[in-house]
């Protein structure tokens, strides 16, 4: 008997069909994320992934593993220690610990991130099943697992997949608490909400939004504030992040410089910024999916579910208004939006599959409908496979190692290079002072700073030996820098790089 909110006829009324479908979804969802497992992580947000890779390598090398030269161990630790810690390095610590048993393989992180996303999908299925229906849960989960951007982003080495998993698990446990306010659900919801916020402080928007929506959808505000369990949940949610902030801002002072540049009041009045925000949201979640998700709000029957979705959408808007620069420039800031759209699609999907179930009541018609749905899933998977196979980045490791050897792995290097020099750091074992790209210059000018290329060149190259260029597109955008470098002889050159010798006087 169907005990879930929907009263529609179920397309997945057969228990075996449902089991096979769910197992297939999660099996394929995990499998496609492991495709091209050992390809270098340069296909998605390489700057952020390399940051985590450098941290994990430094943590691992600090344990004195065998077979690593002392100079490399010291450099790895130094590269780790000099990286900013905006949030706790939880995932990096997990990966570094795993390196003790597997050796250093960056793709270990890809497996962990994929697992986090899959586990999040399990909680999403349970949540939507309880709020909408089994049919809605199947479609919401399929979207969450197989939207192309979600596949590529969810296997990246950064805290976001872990954060999204924790957010969704909080949604489910809090929803269970609203149905049965026991101390077990209280503690679980508080701990999972606290974990999500600790992983990344921005998760607070989606934890609070869900809690407010579900809470006010079920109880009055007077009932909520009178419940001791609510205060315990709030305390458990706040304490972990508060302790980290106290350590970083008061005790050890390593966070003071990390919270600037997140909010620009002027961008709130910029139409272009809102267009860029929409563009990033459409890239991450799909413009049509967002539209159908919004239309899905009209199909919600239960007050608690409706308020839950209102809370999520409302907090997403506040999240974007607060992170007004990053929401329009960093597409991975949209990752928590994917499960919001997934849940919002469920009511419309439930209605659609109910109509499909009525129209395919016969056995053969039902089989044909299943084949059509399977074809759609196969097509999406094949397109994702083609995308993942498109570029083989593995040869780049040898190029960066060659550059490091040419530069001698020492100091005295300035570089105009990709990802703030982190490819050079990781595969080339070479540190460098990084010349700003045009995006950085624009960002700092937005914050009120000014930039003079000639003055900056004289300051940064004073006492240096080499100037490395690997980002030639960026060099073409900075004509003043190009002119300054043309006065120096070329020290070394290869496929994808050129090194200028700063030790010699400029040519007359």
Where are these regions (language model features)?
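Transmembrane-helix signature of polytopic, membrane-embedded enzymes
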Residues: 26, 124-146, 164-165, 184, ...
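Transmembrane alpha-helical segments
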Residues: 30-34, 203, 348-353, 363-392, ...
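Transmembrane-helix motifs of polytopic, lipid-linked glycan transferases
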Residues: 108-131, 169-173
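Membrane-interface transmembrane helices that cradle and orient dolichyl/undecaprenyl
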Residues: 129-135, 170-186, 196, 300
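Short periplasmic/luminal acceptor-recognition loop of GT-C membrane glycosyltransferases, typified by
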Residues: 389, 404-442, 465-472
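Short helix- or helix-capping micro-motifs
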Residues: 29, 140-145, 193, 197, ...
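Short acidic/glycine- and proline-prone juxtamembrane loop motifs at membrane-interface regions
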Residues: 149-162
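Transmembrane-lumen/periplasm boundary regions of multi-pass, lipid-linked membrane glycan transferases
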Residues: 52-62, 195-198, 204-308, 312, ...
């Amino acid at each position: 008997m169907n005990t879930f909110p929907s009263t529609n006829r179920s397309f997945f009324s057969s228990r075996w069909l449902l089991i096979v479908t769910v197992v297939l979804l999660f099996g394929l969802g995990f499998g496609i994320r492991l495709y091209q497992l050992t390809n270098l992580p340069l296909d998605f947000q390489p700057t952020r992934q390399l940051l985590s890779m450098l941290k994990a390598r430094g943590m691992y090398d600090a344990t004195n593993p065998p077979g690593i030269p002392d100079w490399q161990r010291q450099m790895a630790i130094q590269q780790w220690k000099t990286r900013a810690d905006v949030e706790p390095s939880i995932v990096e610590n997990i990966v570094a610990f795993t390196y003790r048993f597997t050796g250093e393989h960056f793709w270990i992180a890809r497996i962990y991130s994929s697992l986090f996303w899959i586990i999040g999908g399990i909680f999403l299925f349970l949540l939507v099943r309880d709020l909408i229906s089994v049919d809605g849960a199947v479609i919401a989960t399929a979207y969450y697992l197989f939207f192309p951007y979600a596949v590529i982003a969810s296997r990246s080495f950064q805290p976001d997949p872990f954060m999204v998993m924790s957010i969704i698990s909080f949604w489910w446990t809090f929803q269970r608490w609203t149905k049965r306010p026991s101390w077990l659900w209280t503690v679980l919801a508080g701990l999972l909400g606290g974990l999500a916020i600790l992983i990344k402080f921005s998760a607070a928007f989606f934890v609070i939004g869900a809690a407010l929506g579900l809470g006010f959808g079920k109880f009055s505000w007077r009932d909520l504030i009178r419940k001791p369990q609510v205060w315990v949940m709030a305390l458990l949610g706040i304490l972990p992040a508060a302790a980290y902030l106290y350590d970083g801002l008061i005790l050890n002072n390593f966070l003071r410089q990390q919270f600037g540049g997140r909010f620009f009041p002027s961008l709130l009045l910029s139409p272009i910024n809102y267009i860029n925000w929409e563009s990033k949201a459409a890239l991450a979640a799909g413009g049509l999916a967002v539209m159908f998700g919004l239309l899905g709000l009209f199909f919600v029957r239960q007050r608690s579910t409706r308020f839950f979705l209102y809370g999520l959408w409302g907090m997403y808007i506040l999240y974007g208004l607060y992170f007004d620069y990053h929401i329009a420039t960093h597409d991975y800031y949209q990752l928590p939006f994917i499960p919001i759209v997934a849940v919002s699609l469920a009511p419309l999907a439930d209605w659609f599959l109910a109509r499909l179930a009525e129209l395919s009541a016969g056995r053969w018609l039902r089989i044909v409908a299943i084949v059509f749905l399977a074809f759609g899933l196969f097509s999406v998977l094949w397109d994702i496979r083609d995308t993942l196979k498109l570029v083989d980045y593995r040869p780049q490791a040898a190029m960066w190692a060659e550059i490091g050897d040419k530069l001698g792995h020492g100091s005295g290097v300035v570089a105009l290079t990709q990802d703030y020099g982190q490819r050079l750091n990781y595969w080339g074992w070479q540190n460098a002072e990084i010349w700003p790209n045009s995006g950085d210059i624009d960002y700092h000018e937005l914050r009120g700073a000014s930039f003079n290329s000639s003055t900056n060149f004289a300051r940064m190259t004073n006492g240096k030996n080499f100037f490395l260029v690997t980002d030639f597109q960026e060099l073409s955008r900075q004509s003043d820098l190009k002119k300054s470098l043309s006065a120096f002889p070329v020290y070394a050159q290869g496929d994808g790089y050129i090194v200028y010798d700063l030790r010699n006087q400029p040519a007359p």
